[in-house]
């Protein structure tokens, strides 16, 4: 077998449609477009959603909801995923290095899950929940926040 002898499987491809090549082909004369009308003409196109002058559906339905501009995108990380890393000190640069967060520009929050903290770790400039703070401090670690957020996030 060679690359130039490989062919697609039987019935997997259709021959392309050749139009305007005589009435015997079934696609001669009008080329499958029918007689007259906008869609039979060259460039006969109407925009998507146009209903012939009737008020289009997307304009008949009422608007709903709104977009919150300036919404904070908080990146949440489980405490158990931090414990898998062989480090004792964590900040945004360490989390980014281990691909736990996508960007260092958005705030990070550590959330608790079922697993308890087995070793003393130090969380620096990372927002935490009350549960995480209790778990970390109970294990002998500490949570340092040098930047206080106005909303307490």
Curated annotation (Swiss-Prot):
One of its GO terms (cellular component) is cytosolic large ribosomal subunit. It comes from Nitrosomonas eutropha (strain DSM 101675 / C91 / Nm57). GO terms for biological process: translation. Binds to the 23S rRNA. This is Large ribosomal subunit protein uL15. Belongs to the universal ribosomal protein uL15 family. Residues 1-42 are annotated as: Disordered. Part of the 50S ribosomal subunit. Gene3D superfamilies: 3.100.10.10.
